């Protein structure tokens, strides 16, 4: 592609260098100031550009893609409020440790604080939510500047995908001409926007880069020290009981084989959150993976003496409370040295790669299961026998969503009640399911967009399960079905409002319905029609199973609305929990 001006040169350099470090997808929100970047990505042979019209949706789409693939999809937008709409997804990427690279176009620096149109202070807009921020220099056909640009881009991706993955923000100022047109004679005092003849020939390294990345960023894994392994192994060997807890995980998840080896060597059972990457997969046939703990923990009188914890804080509140109240030595394993344990009862922070630590400890101990593990081996299958066919209506939809999902497939589950019902009713199984959710900040915005972004990152079938309010929040995200060519089975559990508030004391207040449950009475069928998506509705488990089984195998997109009543489901959950505790506690 020709380089008629320095903006075109700058945009081409950005796209070329990002391609050398493995970037395969870019997400573009339309706008004028970002034209040099958009054109470069759109015309690049090795990068697939996706154009999404709404910045908030685009950012969540990129988030979902990175959650599924482990690689960022650079986000491009114009100046002004456009980049503010990226912010919710940036927060989720920060708190959930998801790689993200933001390329926000800006006006030339002399327009700052001038009242110029579509001009805001974009510096550090995202605050501490980004791993690093930099305003790039203005485009110029200067060898040192281009080498600096290439270096910055390589470092940005290295930081975004490093030991603590997360967002990196590069602010990119451009002055006109923004299009790939020859630069006009500039006004006095304004830099010439032309690329000198022979520039690339005279400066090949700056203009063309290297055969690979301009700068190779080598990210290492933190090996556990021998002292740490010995101390943990000693604690495990001395304990009468123990437990492995796997919460929502960062990509890549701890290697399943290493967790199987750890469970086998320690004799500890594994409590696997549905978002841990470890509740589903072939390894469950070889390890004591538990998923029903949310309901049966009150029936478990014993507590562990040692707990080894991987990932973020578990979804299950009963499990968090159980760990809080256990007089146990709790080892938090975190490769970035972060702290994600809000009850503040953990005793040890182990800064090490999770897979390497699990393997090292497994090699260092040889312990047989004790009475605590034996009790869990009774409770876990007993729980699933009790609840089979007895799940509350909403819980049954989550149980069926994973049980009937194709093998392999990607399942994205919304916050609020869906992820909790999946935690409670999604039985461990050997199918290869990649189950994802936005548990960093646990918002209900951007759910459809994140799910579709995850689907874009894989050839596996995609299932998205959302509540009605989350669906309402992100109906515009459905445009990605056609614009990005993503097929999905979207399950909308519609209980007409915020059903989760039934679990709070405010339920008894006279203002509960109007201000908290907030029934909306919306008919979602026209929303599917707006985006030319098939729509079906049911209010029964049998109807759902039939519609769902047909949809997941169709290779097309369909929204399946399941109508439920939140008050009844809350009462049914409570009654079932009490029945489980009574039966299993005997």
UniProtKB/Swiss-Prot annotation:
Q: Which Pfam families match?
A: TPP_enzyme_C, TPP_enzyme_N
According to UniProt, the reaction catalysed is: isochorismate + 2-oxoglutarate + H(+) = 5-enolpyruvoyl-6-hydroxy-2-succinyl-cyclohex-3-ene-1-carboxylate + CO2
**Which GO biological process categories is it annotated with?**
menaquinone biosynthetic process; organic acid metabolic process; sulfur compound biosynthetic process
Cite the EC number: 2.2.1.9
Q: Which cofactor does it need?
A: Mg(2+); Mn(2+); thiamine diphosphate
Cite the cofactor comment: Binds 1 thiamine pyrophosphate per subunit.
The biological pathway it contributes to is: Quinol/quinone metabolism; 1,4-dihydroxy-2-naphthoate biosynthesis; 1,4-dihydroxy-2-naphthoate from chorismate: step 2/7; Quinol/quinone metabolism; menaquinone biosynthesis
Q: Does the keyword Magnesium apply?
A: yes
| CDD domains cross-referenced by the UniProt entry | TPP_PYR_MenD, TPP_SHCHC_synthase
Ordered alphabetically, the record's keywords are:
Magnesium, Manganese, Menaquinone biosynthesis, Metal-binding, Thiamine pyrophosphate, Transferase
Task: Look up keyword Magnesium and say if it applies.
Answer: yes
Task: Kindly state the subunit structure of this protein.
Answer: Homodimer.
Mind telling me which HAMAP family this protein's record contains?
MenD
Record family assignment: Belongs to the TPP enzyme family. MenD subfamily.
Record-given protein name: 2-succinyl-5-enolpyruvyl-6-hydroxy-3-cyclohexene-1-carboxylate synthase
What is the species of this protein?
A: Natronomonas pharaonis (strain ATCC 35678 / DSM 2160 / CIP 103997 / JCM 8858 / NBRC 14720 / NCIMB 2260 / Gabara) (Halobacterium pharaonis)
Q: Show the taxonomic lineage.
A: Archaea, Methanobacteriati, Methanobacteriota, Stenosarchaea group, Halobacteria
